[in-house]
């Protein structure tokens, strides 16, 4: 989840509290929590980075038709009334007043994630609350509906977060999701710096299983990173945040949208070339590398250098991993996507790799393998694995209220109309 942007320049910051490393890690931590749009705007205003030819190519700085990238006279957002209908309408079965909103547990570009208890059911949920105005301003309606669509397909897979309800008020959208309180993989990596190989293998296997399932539905995830990987209360992986997913990508299909998280962008994405499902296997390689070594494979504090590393620098692997791990990383982090592991048979190639030979995949999917780490949460109210930056923040009163219709402006009504079809209530037997 995106929190806040790092400063464009400034003195080195310390990181003794978590990893015991200094400026490189605090810069890394802040940088990767930025949305890609904010990150691109940051490097576009950095004179040093802009001089690098690879960065210029990525940003197309020499072309004046993209003023928003340079923060120069950005064009106004389109009128909400001109937005597309985002899907077939359904009868909403939930409203904000159905919930007690207890704690802020996350923040994103368009809103917050809150721990909430359903008043009638006494069930705990993670409720993602998004501001329509912010979504429309950045023209992100398609990504929001894409996230909803992907969530609707997730109820059958154990390593993907499930959607229980989605509904809307005049000014907000609400995703009512599984509540997962074992912490982000990123949080645990901060604390422990890296994992032993058996633990990294277990997580990589569950992640690969989730990605393989999405690919079987012709969905490319595109934003795999430790912040989007949660641990449940037993220590199993749960993949979340599907806003950048691309639907309807057949086995040999490609797409070309420039999106993702900077440290994890595959070379073909940076080159603005068409890319396919193998972009997810590159990201899996980057996450596995980080679990084993503590940082992504081509990371640099200098943006231009990091992009140049991804595009041109050979993969460097220290000798403290097994040969099978080395071989897997070399296959996943292959710069030529046509030669990348998974290019031919997708998930089948991954699970058949020798690195995963200790994994019984049937037991894995049925959660019969004991996780190597137990978060030891005492119950839903145990928030020890959430960042205090979130949990110390007061819950806004407006979250649990529907705006008074008398006070709603015409523009707010138009915004509401832009998200027709967002609301969702599952069939009675969908979770049986």
UniProtKB/Swiss-Prot annotation:
Annotated AGC-kinase C-terminal domain residues: 357-432
CC per GO annotation: cytoplasm; endoplasmic reticulum; nucleus
Keywords, alphabetical: Apoptosis, ATP-binding, Cytoplasm, Endoplasmic reticulum, Kinase, Nucleotide-binding, Nucleus, Phosphoprotein, Serine/threonine-protein kinase, Stress response, Transferase
Positions of region (Disordered): 67-93
Classification via InterPro entries: AGC-kinase_C, Kinase-like_dom_sf, Pkinase_C, Prot_kinase_dom, Protein_kinase_ATP_BS, Ser/Thr_kinase_AS
Annotated CDD domains: STKc_SGK (cd05575)
GO molecular function, one term: ATP binding
Family to which the UniProt record says this protein belongs: Belongs to the protein kinase superfamily. AGC Ser/Thr protein kinase family.
Protein name stated in the entry: Serine/threonine-protein kinase Sgk1
């Amino acid at each position: 989840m995106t929190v806040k942007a790092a400063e464009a320049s400034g003195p080195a910051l310390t990181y003794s509290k978590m990893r015991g490393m200094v400026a490189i890690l605090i810069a890394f931590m802040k940088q990767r929590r930025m949305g890609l749009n904010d990150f691109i705007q940051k490097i576009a205003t950095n004179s040093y980075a802009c001089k690098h030819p690879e960065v210029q190519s990525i940003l197309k700085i020499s072309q004046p038709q993209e003023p928003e990238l340079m923060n120069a006279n950005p064009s106004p957002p389109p009128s909400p009334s001109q937005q597309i209908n985002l899907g077939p309408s359904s009868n909403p079965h939930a409203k904000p007043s159905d919930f007690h909103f207890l704690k802020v547990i996350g923040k994103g570009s368009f809103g917050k994630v809150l721990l909430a208890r359903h008043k009638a059911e006494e069930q705990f949920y993670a409720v993602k609350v998004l501001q329509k105005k912010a979504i429309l301003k950045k023209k992100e309606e398609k990504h929001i509906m894409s996230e909803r669509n992907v969530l609707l397909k997730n109820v059958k897979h154990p390593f993907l977060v499930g959607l229980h309800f989605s509904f809307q008020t005049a000014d907000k959208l609400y995703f009512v999701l599984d509540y997962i309180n074992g912490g982000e993989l990123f949080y645990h990596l901060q604390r422990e710096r890296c994992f032993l190989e058996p633990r990294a293998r277990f997580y990589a296997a569950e992640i690969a299983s989730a990605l393989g399932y999405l690919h079987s539905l012709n969905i490319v995830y595109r934003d795999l990173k430790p912040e989007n990987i949660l641990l449940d209360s037993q220590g199993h992986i749960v993949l979340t945040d599907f806003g950048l997913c691309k639907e309807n990508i057949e086995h040999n299909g490609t797409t070309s949208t420039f999106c993702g998280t900077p440290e994890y962008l595959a070379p073909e994405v940076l080159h603005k070339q068409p890319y396919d499902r193998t972009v997810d296997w590159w990201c899996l390689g980057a996450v596995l590398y980080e679990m084993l070594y503590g940082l992504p494979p081509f990371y640099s504090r200098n943006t231009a250098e990091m992009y140049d590393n991804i595009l041109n620098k050979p993969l460097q692997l220290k000798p403290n991993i097994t040969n099978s791990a080395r071989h897997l990383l070399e296959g996943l982090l292959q710069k030529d996507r046509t030669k990348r592991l998974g290019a031919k048979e997708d998930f089948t190639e991954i699970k058949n790799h020798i690195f995963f030979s200790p994994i019984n995949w049937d037991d894995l999917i049925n959660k019969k393998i004991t996780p190597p780490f137990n978060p030891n949460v005492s119950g839903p109210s145990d928030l020890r694995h959430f960042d205090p930056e979130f949990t110390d923040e007061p819950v806004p009163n407006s979250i649990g209220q529907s705006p008074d219709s008398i006070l709603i402006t015409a523009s707010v009504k138009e915004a509401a109309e832009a998200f027709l079809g967002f609301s969702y209530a599952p069939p009675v037997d969908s979770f049986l």
